[in-house]
């Protein structure tokens, strides 16, 4: 049985509990003589993890939804006795990581942590991050199978210290269980379940703790937040915007109103046309609309953003209209205000602020050039 963070803390022996500089009115994790609570890592946006810091450099990372616990332990620190079996101990430095969750790679790059990854769940040609692709082509990172079919022999031979998965692994739980039977810790990261872009970006602190680069993570996160500060002082542009793609079965795939892409449109000063679309009983951030409903909601949008991730890049208006003839009647198509995301966008987790700044230029400039993640559909 998995223990929650609260259950873990309650399970520590009462005979050795100590208070570590906290007043009686504060709610803080209990401490033991071997694991003495110091402080909780402050998080401004993220809700899918917590980090409790203990004396001696120990940090307990908790995945809030699953309740999974990971005790990050400094290289030369003593082993903590009496931990519940549900706590996974990760002793630094964590080497030979099997990285399956592609959104994590860009955060590792920002922390200069690429050398800790030696196994990938994505082939070289599947990476849009130049450094990751180059590392695979040079043989510094090897392909070790996708999430549902790990190459156990290769993973074991590499002396893998940690497998980093996303929640897709829950579709094939036997793969996760087999890795754990081989003694390989499995961490299922949940950054994609954060509702906002800055909450996703704040996972930089999670990986900074894991890699022993907390200060760098704090500095980089603060720098990214600061870059957005000028936009908060500006009035909304009034530009209405849709973010979509046309599926193979003639539906419009759009983001729900609470999704982080919708929030980025708002942060950039725009109005997301499907802001009222809410959760329809699943945890997906997208939903498919009949073309008639999409037409009704987005026909008068000032800006159209085409999502290239699944259905591919659209270069021209002719290509776009070939996917859906109704689009020829859209205001943004007729005015030439249609943009397509680059295919690298969803792997570049550190680029969320850049994307917001790109959007702001689209909303405020007549014909912005040299955007990082948007290309004009001519």
Predicted features along the sequence, with ranges:
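N-terminal export leaders
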Residues: 5-9
């Amino acid at each position: 049985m998995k223990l929650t963070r609260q259950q873990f803390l309650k399970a520590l022996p009462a005979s050795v509990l100590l208070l570590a500089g906290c007043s009686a009115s504060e709610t803080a994790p209990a401490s033991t003589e071997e694991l003495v609570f110091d402080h909780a890592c402050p998080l401004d946006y993220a809700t899918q993890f917590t980090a409790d810091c203990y004396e001696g450099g120990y940090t307990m990372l908790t995945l809030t939804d699953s309740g999974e616990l990971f005790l990050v332990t400094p290289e030369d620190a003593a082993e903590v006795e009496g931990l519940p079996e549900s706590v996974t101990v990760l002793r630094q430095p964590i080497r030979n990581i099997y990285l399956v969750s592609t959104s994590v790679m860009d955060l590792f790059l920002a922390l200069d942590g690429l050398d800790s990854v030696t196994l990938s769940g994505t082939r070289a040609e599947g990476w849009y991050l130049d450094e990751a692709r180059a590392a695979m082509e040079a043989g510094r990172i090897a392909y070790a199978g996708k999430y549902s079919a790990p190459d156990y022999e290769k993973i074991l031979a590499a002396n893998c210290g940690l497998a980093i998965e996303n929640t897709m692994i829950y579709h094939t739980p036997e793969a996760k269980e087999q890795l754990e039977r081989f003694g390989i810790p499995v961490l299922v990261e949940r950054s994609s379940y954060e509702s906002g872009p800055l909450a996703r970006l704040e996972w930089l602190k999670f990986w900074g703790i894991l890699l022993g680069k907390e200060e760098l993570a704090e500095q980089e996160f603060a720098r990214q937040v600061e870059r957005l500060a000028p936009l908060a002082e500006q009035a909304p542009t009034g530009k209405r915007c849709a973010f979509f793609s046309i599926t193979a079965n003639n539906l419009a795939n759009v983001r729900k109103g609470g999704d982080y892409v919708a929030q980025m449109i708002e942060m950039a000063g725009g109005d997301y046309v499907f802001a009222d679309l809410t959760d329809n009983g699943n945890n997906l951030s997208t939903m498919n609309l009949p073309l008639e409903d999409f037409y009704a909601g987005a026909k008068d949008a000032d800006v159209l953003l085409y999502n290239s991730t699944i259905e591919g890049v659209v270069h021209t208006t002719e290509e776009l209209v070939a996917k859906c003839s109704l689009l020829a009647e859209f205001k943004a198509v007729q005015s030439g205000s249609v943009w397509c995301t680059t295919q690298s966008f969803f792997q570049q987790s550190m680029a969320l602020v850049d994307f917001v700044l790109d959007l702001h230029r689209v909303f405020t400039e007549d014909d912005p050039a040299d955007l990082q993640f948007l290309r004009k559909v001519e």
